[in-house]
């Protein structure tokens, strides 16, 4: 499905309908001119001051759009265009598959990108020996979790990865797969392997059923697709999640601004604000239950011997925290959502 259609159907449509209505538009020729010209951030003729924020299409798409919305990055994307100019910042957004992003970030063509850690690892594994990656991971975004796993037919005799040595393995991650089997075979990375690694861009899970492969190396999220294809995982190559990456060559001051905004949104998604009253005598124990990110906020109540406590708590732990607070004498426990934040 086209990105703009998914965007219009999402819960983010209110952002598009209001603040995005007057966003500047970029023609197809302007797009090609922008990405092909020598990269100069001081170029006053650039429609985005030559600053590009790179984001993604695919399985990370909707969470990325929500993250940009929460960071007040206002844009409008025209149908069939891979680029959108931001209304309220001198930034251009480029929408491309996650696999392409580390290359553009690493070569310094763009400053920031959102992609999977697996894609960064695949990019880095392709670099010549001794070459330093131009991609720097700066934040785990906490969504898009998956594993790059070695998989084989459920009904077969193979139960561990080393049994695939010398056989056919199909994958979209050829560099990581080659590095993995190089370790299994005990040879230097880049040397000829007895294992035959073949590249397939999509539908990797069908390779075994079609007789093309004895095993595959592919991403697994829930595992449902793997099971439906009659496969089982026997080893893990890389564990992945969505990450914010930047070019090591960037000097753009907006990088820190955007990073701070994204960090604030991620914090707001992960935490809630827990407020409760408790006798001062129980404050020490309660503070250990709700230590906050730095320390809890404590306010004396008019009722003598009582205090009010406010503390940030991880959302996934809040039910247990509330139970523990009740046990130590807390009352009037409230949990409030955090819309956004800036934390140290």
Q: Predicted segment positions?
A:
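Small-molecule-sensing regulatory modules
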Residues: 1-95, 107, 114-147, 156-344
């Amino acid at each position: 499905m086209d990105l703009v259609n998914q965007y219009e159907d999402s819960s983010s449509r209110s952002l598009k309908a209001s603040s995005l209505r007057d966003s500047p538009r970029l023609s197809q020729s302007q797009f090609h001119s922008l990405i092909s010209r020598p990269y100069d951030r001081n170029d006053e003729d650039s429609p985005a001051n030559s600053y590009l924020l790179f984001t993604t299409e695919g399985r990370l798409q909707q969470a990325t759009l929500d993250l940009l919305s929460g960071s007040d990055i206002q844009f409008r994307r025209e149908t069939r265009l891979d680029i959108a100019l931001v209304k309220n910042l001198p930034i251009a957004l480029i929408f491309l598959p996650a696999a392409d992003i580390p290359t553009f970030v690493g070569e310094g063509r763009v400053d920031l990108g959102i992609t999977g850690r697996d894609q960064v690892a695949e990019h880095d594994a392709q670099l010549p020996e001794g070459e330093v990656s131009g991609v720097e991971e700066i934040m785990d975004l906490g969504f898009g979790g998956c594993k790059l796993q070695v998989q084989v037919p459920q009904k077969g005799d193979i139960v561990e990865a080393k049994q695939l040595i010398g056989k056919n393995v199909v994958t979209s991650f050829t560099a990581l797969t080659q590095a993995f089997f190089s370790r299994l075979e005990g040879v230097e990375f880049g040397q000829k392997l007895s294992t035959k690694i073949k590249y397939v861009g999509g539908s990797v899970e069908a390779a075994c059923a079609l007789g093309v492969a004895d095993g595959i190396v592919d991403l697994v999220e829930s595992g449902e697709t793997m099971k439906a294809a009659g496969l089982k995982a026997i080893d893990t190559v890389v564990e992945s999640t969505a990450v914010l990456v930047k070019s090591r060559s960037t000097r753009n001051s907006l990088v820190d601004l955007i990073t701070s905004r994204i960090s604030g949104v991620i914090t707001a998604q992960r935490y809630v604000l827990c407020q409760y009253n408790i006798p001062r005598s129980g404050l020490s124990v309660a503070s250990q239950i709700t230590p906050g990110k730095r320390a809890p906020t404590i306010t004396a109540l008019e009722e003598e011997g009582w205090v009010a406590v406010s503390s940030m708590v991880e959302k996934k732990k809040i039910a247990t925290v509330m139970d523990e607070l009740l046990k130590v004498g807390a009352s009037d426990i409230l949990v409030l959502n955090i819309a956004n934040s800036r934390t140290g």
